[in-house]
Regions:
Chain A
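ABC transporter nucleotide-binding domains
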Residues: 2-7, 12-204, 208-210
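ABC transporter nucleotide-binding domain
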Residues: 169-261
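Structural motif
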Residues: 149, 245-248, 278-279
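C-terminal coupling/interaction segments
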Residues: 263-304
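Hydrophobic alpha-helical segments typical of transmembrane helices
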Residues: 97, 112, 116, 213, ...
Length: 304, 272
């Protein structure tokens, strides 16, 4: 097995502040690897290290078999990068800007830019500074994908994109994978990348908390449930639910509508079966924001 | 070799120029306006009845020498005092300050340098090409200056040797390049536009002040030796021709400063 990205104890400190703390990651060639974590977890720092925009304090990284520092410009021609905060300015059209980036990246096949722009619904004749955030993001995606690089490094690629374009983006990722390209992407929301990524690493405070496939991560994710009942006794419901080991933080608010809230770790099967005898008016299962589910993951890891 | 075929010549310099041509147009108009305003006025001052010398004589002691107005009666002295040594110098300093601080530090502060760096270009290439873009724009303003002064040479009566006009404009160009090299290097080292601007404007101002102080008396004449402004203009290039040795020193220092800036830039983290 070859690795498109391999890091060993990769560490980046800014003064006393540790942005990335001894991260070991391997991304298999041809895979789609997601990195999730709250803002400030170190996702962007890790990506900048891979592109030699910043240098590690200690540890090392290998990208496409080379160190980003010694690989230099030639290595970066084989990478397509989308920065997390894409700032595009200037009185130039999208087409002219992309032409410039094509000149300083790997060779771009004729017609490729137009094909990508059309897929994403991006107007290349407009001046860059007049573009909305979503359209700038599309421009950023085009410049990352256009030279069909061996490795795509995409920081929060779906941010600002509407759901239809997100779908198109996911199909571009799948095509890239089909072509043998490797995709390394980040998000602060698991749901945005769960359909794309084979493997996911959860980052928190600069360390990798967990690595696994999406299914196993989802199974261990903590979700918040809200259930409304009518025509039932609050005490009966409480008794039935207290018996469930997966359910925590239970509250039962009595009234005409009895509202039950709680958090569920893992599958919700047992919960659904436990409430089946009662009259359920509404059932909402919400994925917690990643901040809290990562905290749960983190504390679970610490307790084991 | 297919990769080298798609590589084009100086992509970053061309982008730099393409992004800035509107601004350059404005600077060209400013430089042209200053020359077209000041140089033709010489004929109205230079006549026997103009009393120009009397006006200078009436200025407080030291002010005339501070402003470099000792020799306003000759065409060379007049163009030196009004354009090359004053308005032109100020315009070149401001242009060099703005352009050099924007080239690396401004781009870094705005966040767009990150994306350029992520492509197939080295830091050294970015430093070299963007510096070249700034130098080219300053060269353009120098060429415009020389051509306009030469165009007005007869009609205004300044009566300068064409080679000396070119020498004087090369000296002005040199001071612009020196200021720009400090702005580019400090911008590349610190990534801060304010530091870059301070360095570029500061080196010009320092040279001007040292020269003015050196003009005051023979006791402090040695201050001239420290002033790039004096290196460029001290020998009165419009009447005597350029002092190529001193200009070589100015361009040499600029090159060293740029190399130092590129050296540090190549080794530091780029922030966003």
């Amino acid at each position: 097995m070859t690795y498109a990205i391999e890091t060993q104890a990769l560490t980046k400190r800014y003064g006393k502040n540790t942005a990335l703390d001894g991260v070991d990651l391997v991304v298999e060639t041809g895979s789609v690897f997601g990195m999730i974590g709250p803002n400030g977890a170190g996702k962007t720092t890790a990506m900048r290290l891979l592109l030699d925009i910043i240098r590690p304090t200690s540890g090392s990284a290998t990208v496409l078999g080379q160190s980003p520092i010694t690989g230099g410009a030639a290595l970066r021609r084989d990478i397509g990068f989308l920065p997390g905060e894409l700032l595009l300015e200037g009185r130039v059209t999208g087409r002219s800007l992309l032409k410039h980036y094509a000149e300083i990246s790997g060779p771009v096949a004729p017609g490729r830019i137009d094909a990508l722009a059309e897929r994403l619904g991006l107007d290349l004749t407009r001046h860059v500074r007049t573009l909305s955030k979503g359209n700038k993001q599309k421009l950023g995606l085009v410049q990352a994908f256009m030279h069909e690089p061996k490795l795509l490094v995409l920081d929060e690629p779906t941010s600002g994109l509407d759901p239809l374009v997100q779908q198109e983006f996911l199909s571009m990722v799948r095509e890239a994978q089909h072509n043998g390209q490797t995709v390394f992407l980040s998000s602060h929301v698991l749901s945005e990348i769960q359909n794309a990524a084979d493997q996911v690493a959860v980052l928190r405070n600069g360390t990798v908390v967990k690595v696994g496939d999406v299914a196993s991560l989802r199974a261990s994710a903590v979700r918040r449930v809200v259930i409304d009942f009518t025509d039932a006794a609050a005490d009966d419901i409480r008794t039935a639910l207290l018996a469930l080991p997966q359910l925590d933080n239970l509250t039962v608010a009595d009234g005409e509508v009895i509202q039950v809230t709680g958090t569920v770790e893992g599958h919700i099967d047992a919960l659904v079966k436990a409430i089946a005898p009662f009259h359920v008016v509404d059932l909402r299962v919400e994925e917690q924001d990643l901040e809290s589910s990562v905290i749960d993951l983190y504390s679970n890891e610490a307790n084991k | 070799m297919s990769q080298t075929m798609t590589r084009s010549i100086l992509p970053l310099t061309r982008r730099n120029l393409a992004d800035s041509w509107r601004g350059l147009l404005g600077w060209t108009a400013g430089v042209a306006g200053a020359i077209l305003l000041y140089v033709p006025l010489y004929s109205s001052f230079s006549g026997d009845n103009a009393g120009f010398e009397d006006i200078i004589g009436s200025l407080p002691d030291g002010l005339a020498s501070t402003l470099g107005f000792q020799d306003l009666a000759s065409g060379a002295g007049y163009v030196q005092a009004t354009y090359l040594g004053l308005i032109g110098f100020v315009l070149f300093t401001i242009a060099a300050t703005l352009w050099s601080s924007a080239a690396i530090a401004g781009d870094e502060e705005s966040g767009s340098l990150e994306l350029t760096l992520a492509h197939g270009v080295s830091r050294v290439q970015i430093m070299a090409e963007r510096s070249f873009g700034v130098v080219l724009r300053l060269l353009w303003l120098s060429v415009v200056s020389a051509l306009l002064i030469l165009a007005l040479n007869d009609s205004s009566g300044i009566d300068l040797e064409p080679a000396h006009v070119i020498g004087g404009c090369v000296a002005l160009f040199g001071l612009g390049v020196l200021a720009a090299s400090f702005g580019l290097a400090i911008g590349a080292i610190t990534g801060r536009r304010s530091f870059a601007s301070a360095a570029a404007a500061g080196i010009s101002l320092l040279g001007y002040i040292l020269n003015s102080l050196g003009n005051q008396s023979a006791d402090v004449d040695w201050l001239h030796n420290l002033s790039p402004y004096y290196w460029a203009f001290g020998n009165s290039p419009l009447s005597e021709g350029a002092d190529w040795g001193s200009l070589g020193l100015i361009f040499g220092i600029s090159a060293v400063v740029l190399v130092l800036g590129g050296f540090v830039f190549n080794r530091r983290d780029v922030s966003a």
